[in-house]
From Swiss-Prot:
<keyword id="KW-0204">Cytolysis</keyword>
<dbReference type="InterPro" id="IPR017946">
    <property type="entry name" value="PLC-like_Pdiesterase_TIM-brl"/>
</dbReference>
<keyword id="KW-0456">Lyase</keyword>
<keyword id="KW-0479">Metal-binding</keyword>
<feature type="disulfide bond">
    <location>
        <begin position="77"/>
        <end position="83"/>
    </location>
</feature>
<feature type="disulfide bond">
    <location>
        <begin position="79"/>
        <end position="222"/>
    </location>
</feature>
<feature type="binding site">
    <location>
        <position position="57"/>
    </location>
    <ligand>
        <name>Mg(2+)</name>
    </ligand>
</feature>
<dbReference type="GO" id="GO:0016042">
    <property type="term" value="P:lipid catabolic process"/>
</dbReference>
<feature type="signal peptide">
    <location>
        <begin position="1"/>
        <end position="17"/>
    </location>
</feature>
<keyword id="KW-0865">Zymogen</keyword>
<dbReference type="GO" id="GO:0016829">
    <property type="term" value="F:lyase activity"/>
</dbReference>
<dbReference type="GO" id="GO:0090729">
    <property type="term" value="F:toxin activity"/>
</dbReference>
<feature type="active site">
    <location>
        <position position="37"/>
    </location>
</feature>
<keyword id="KW-0460">Magnesium</keyword>
<keyword id="KW-0732">Signal</keyword>
<dbReference type="GO" id="GO:0031640">
    <property type="term" value="P:killing of cells of another organism"/>
</dbReference>
<dbReference type="GO" id="GO:0008081">
    <property type="term" value="F:phosphoric diester hydrolase activity"/>
</dbReference>
């Protein structure tokens, strides 16, 4: 009799797991990345994830020799935020690695993607390639742990200037040179300067990039910005000949703006208040159309309805 009971329990567990798997695969809702904005201190990682973020955006400043130096934004920044929090870049990477490595005491399973907002405006155009190489070296050592059970989050390199597209090649070349070209599978790209979509496409052609493309659009929360360019980016994403895989909008702090962005069809919302976005996603008008993205959602894959 105990054997029969055990068999029944095992069968029940297996059938439940199979049902969950089928339900997840059958879930036709658009996965959404809730992107915590300006997370520049290690302590803020937990703060934003605990508020509902499944991804974060971190500012990266460079020194005169194109070395990534600090996770720092500076003044001015978004209304209602402290602009001055910072860490040494490599220290932040170590903290981030702890937060995104399964088994670590600081592990946050929900944190699946990190956008590095690369402040390359301080660099000359001819330093972009070198900045990419140095960025790759730092990430390989301090985040990816030289390819040995490092952090698992997907990484988006967000570049503000189209002329700095050589940064992408420098980054890729350095990972290849150091014996870890496979880590490019975890890396995506974004040009954040609100340039014309066609010009962004041309920059990717020059960089030799196809795929893994996120397209941002937005402005500081202190100002208003319409959704015209977001809709252009979404049209590109959804067209057969488009080069964009995902679109995100920043900085979204209000429920009404969140609803407008979701109605337009964005994949990500960058915010100072992740709990606001979570609340909207739970509203009856949205919970059947959208869900918070998990690690199983490929951030480089265009969502098909």
């Amino acid at each position: 009799l105990p054997y029969i009971a055990l068999i029944l329990v095992c069968w029940s567990v297996l059938s439940q797991a199979a049902q969950t798997d089928v339900e997840e695969r059958a879930d036709k809702r658009r996965p959404i990345w809730i992107m915590g904005h300006m997370v520049n201190a290690i302590a803020q990682i937990d703060e934003f994830v605990n508020l509902g973020a499944n991804s974060i955006e971190t500012d990266v400043s460079f020194d005169d020799n194109a070395n990534p130096e600090y996770t720092y934004h500076g003044i001015p920044c978004d209304c209602g935020r402290s602009c001055l929090k910072w860490e040494n870049f490599n220290d932040f990477l170590k903290g981030l690695r702890s937060a995104t490595t399964p088994g670590n005491a600081k592990y946050q399973a929900k944190l699946i993607l990190v956008v590095f907002d690369l402040k390359t405006g301080s660099l000359y155009d001819n330093q972009a390639n070198e900045a990419g190489k140095k960025l790759a070296k730092n990430l390989l050592k301090h985040y990816w742990n030289n390819g040995n059970n490092g952090g698992r989050a997907y990484i988006v390199l967000s570049i503000p200037d189209l002329n700095h597209y050589p940064l992408i090649k420098g980054f890729k070349d350095q990972l290849t040179q150091d014996g870890h070209p496979e880590l490019m599978d975890k890396v995506g790209h974004d040009f954040s300067g609100n340039d014309a979509i066609g010009d962004v496409g041309n920059a990717y052609k020059k960089a030799g990039i196809s795929g893994h493309v996120w397209q941002s659009d937005g402005i500081t929360n202190c100002l208003l910005r319409g959704l015209d360019r977001v809709k252009q980016a979404i049209a590109n994403r959804d067209s057969a000949k488009g080069f964009i895989n995902k679109v995100y909008y920043w900085t979204v702090d209000k429920r009404a703006t969140t609803r407008d962005a979701l109605d337009a069809g964005v994949d990500g919302v960058m915010t100072n208040y992740p709990d606001v976005i979570t609340d909207v996603l739970n509203e009856s008008a949205y919970k059947n159309k959208f869900r918070v993205a998990s690690y199983e959602d490929n951030p480089w894959e265009t969502f098909k309805k």
